Amino acid sequence: KESSAEKFLRQHVDSIDSPGNLSPTYCNQMMLRRNMTKGSCKPVNTFVHEPLKDIKAVCFQENVTCKNGNSNCYKSHASLHITDCRTISSSKYPDCAYKTSQEQKHIIVACEGDPFVPVHYDASV
């Protein structure tokens, strides 16, 4: 079974594709490739284009409260290269269609475990 940490990697980490070179169809391709269009179209998802070590390091940066009230969220000191994928209104499962938006924002992730690693993407600010 996929662990929470593995799920985070699959859903949110894309260290290979460099921002600025992404095509408008990036989200359509990646959401499909990373299994986020199985059974339904995941409405919103964010990919982070930074080295994995830099994403994991966020777990040791600024401690903030998560959206659900938990206290195990951490905000990145720096703004990171991210891509937001959002379903477009005309999109209908199984033909999931996404708008690709490239941004530079601080990320907030929930971390847990030993080693202490990201397990949930909480927000971009």
Swiss-Prot record:
The active site is at H12 (proton acceptor), H120 (proton donor). It is found in: Secreted. One of its GO terms (cellular component) is extracellular region. Keywords: Disulfide bond, Endonuclease, Glycoprotein, Hydrolase, Lyase, Nuclease, Secreted. Substrate binds at K7, R10, K42, P43, V44, N45, T46, K67, R86. Belongs to the pancreatic ribonuclease family. Monomer. Interacts with and forms tight 1:1 complexes with RNH1. Dimerization of two such complexes may occur. Interaction with RNH1 inhibits this protein. This is Ribonuclease pancreatic. The lineage of its organism: Eukaryota, Metazoa, Chordata, Craniata, Vertebrata. The gene is RNASE1.
